[in-house]
């Protein structure tokens, strides 16, 4: 392989590894473990409005937002308009539930402006189970930590909304 092509590949591999090291997935990983996981992830660049995952589609990929943002959005059937339910930014994970259980996505993931994400397919992570089980364990811990934060936030929002609706605790 020509030297220039090899350097390009090494540069992209180094960039990908650096992006992975700075992500929530790598919080508990050593440098060597990051390198192993880095071989499994890919980088995807999206333009404004690109749909990363379609509403109702099953998808086995986990995404880490490297730059830009993703809208968690549903398309209104009657009008075709998009309704944004939540916005995910740099450092956030997306698609974690579909990654874990393969169920169809309740909402789509759409790029807000130019967006770059790291992609990890479930099958690729599972391929490490026998030879690198610690990496799989630590990545899954990272995913569950993120899901736990989301669930806590949703519980707090539900509580605040309930208090508001029923005018509980004299806050409203």
Regions found by a protein language model. Name each.
Residues 1-172:
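Cytosolic regulatory regions built on CNB/CRP/Popeye-like sensor folds
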